[in-house]
UniProtKB/Swiss-Prot annotation:
Part of the ribosomal stalk of the 50S ribosomal subunit. The N-terminus interacts with L11 and the large rRNA to form the base of the stalk. The C-terminus forms an elongated spine to which L12 dimers bind in a sequential fashion forming a multimeric L10(L12)X complex. The lineage of its organism: Bacteria, Bacillati, Actinomycetota, Actinomycetes, Mycobacteriales. SUPFAM superfamilies: Ribosomal protein L10-like. Residues 172-196 have a biased composition (Low complexity). HAMAP family: Ribosomal_uL10. This is Large ribosomal subunit protein uL10. Belongs to the universal ribosomal protein uL10 family. Signal peptide: none annotated. InterPro entries: Ribosomal_uL10, Ribosomal_uL10-like_sf, Ribosomal_uL10_bac, Ribosomal_uL10_bac_type, Ribosomal_uL10_CS_bac.
Amino acid sequence: MARADKATAVADIAEQFKEATATLITEYRGLTVANLAELRRSLSGAATYSVAKNTLVKRAASEAGIEGLDELFAGPTAIAFVTGEPVDAAKAIKTFAKEHKALVIKGGYMDGRALSVAEVERIADLESREVLLAKLAGAMKGNLAKAAGLFNAPASQVARLAAALQEKKAAECPAEAPQPAAETPAEAPEAPADAE
């Protein structure tokens, strides 16, 4: 590869690193071209899957300001540059790796830090953003429906509830009859003295 071609390749890879929300790094030793094409299809729009020389990828990562991945760039390495939801891409790669033992997840990079294999697999085990938002909306809807039912209850139901509580309280501890207050004669007010 000519020097100008290498510089162009490094610039392209660096741009992919900068635009990606996450990167997933794999070893593809033993996979056929058909397997790689199948993996790319399974990633659909969530990521692009690229194979490049490790030296070029190391330079591109350095140019993009990404650190901590150099040890992952050894052997036949391919990178999934995730532009969509990281969970979807990680799920696709993890599923493919289970079906094709030749694909090995090496790690990744997301939110400014390197990810271990275990962290990439934990991301793959998460539910997608849409599912989590749907669950949150469902929980909120249920609570809002309960509150709306409470606020829409007729005033008569509230009055009956208050009366029932009052009767229950009266039955539990009968109120003592109030003692009549002892009457005391009222004193006549004193007349003011005239100073004449």
